[in-house]
Amino acid sequence: MARIAGIDLPRNKRIEIALTYIFGIGRTTAQRILAETGVSADTRTDNLAESEVAKIRDYIDKNLKVEGDLRRDVSMDIKRLMDLGCYRGLRHRKGLPVRGQRTKTNARTRKGPARTVAGKKK
C-alpha cells in the first residue's frame, strides 16, 4: 500500500486518480507530478514499485504544499482577513458569501438552513 503525505492511497485505482485523494493535489497537479517523476499515469497503485513511490513522495515533499501545511495556510489566510477587518474578513466572520454573490435569495450553503421570521410576509 502506498502511503504519501500521511494518506493511504487506494490500491485499485490508477495512480493519477489516487494522488487526488491528497488534499491540495488535483488532476492537473497529479499529471504534472507523474510527468516530472517519469511514472506512467496508467499504473495501478498496487503495481507501483517502491522506488516509484519514493520518487513521487520526494517530489511532493520538495515542491508542493499539501495536507496539514496547506490547510493551516488557508485557515491562517482567512484568520488574517478577519483580523484586518476588511470586507472579505467581515463576510467570513458573519458566515456570508465572500465573493459578491447575492444573499436576498440563495446563499443557503453559507447561511445555513432558512429561519422563519415572524410577521414577515412576501
UniProtKB/Swiss-Prot annotation:
Residue ranges crossing the lipid bilayer per the database entry: none
GO CC term (a single one): cytosol
Classification via SUPFAM superfamilies: S13-like H2TH domain
Biological process per Gene Ontology, one example term: translation
Molecular-function GO terms, alphabetical: rRNA binding; structural constituent of ribosome; tRNA binding
InterPro entries per UniProt: Rbsml_uS13_C, Ribosomal_uS13, Ribosomal_uS13-like_H2TH, Ribosomal_uS13_bac-type, Ribosomal_uS13_CS
Disordered: annotated span: 97-122
Highest taxon in the source lineage: Bacteria
Keyword annotations of the record: Ribonucleoprotein, Ribosomal protein, RNA-binding, rRNA-binding, tRNA-binding
A Pfam family recorded for this sequence: Ribosomal_S13
HAMAP family in UniProt: Ribosomal_uS13
Protein family membership: Belongs to the universal ribosomal protein uS13 family.
Annotated function: Located at the top of the head of the 30S subunit, it contacts several helices of the 16S rRNA. In the 70S ribosome it contacts the 23S rRNA (bridge B1a) and protein L5 of the 50S subunit (bridge B1b), connecting the 2 subunits; these bridges are implicated in subunit movement. Contacts the tRNAs in the A and P-sites.
Assembly information from the UniProt record: Part of the 30S ribosomal subunit. Forms a loose heterodimer with protein S19. Forms two bridges to the 50S subunit in the 70S ribosome.
Protein name per Swiss-Prot or TrEMBL: Small ribosomal subunit protein uS13
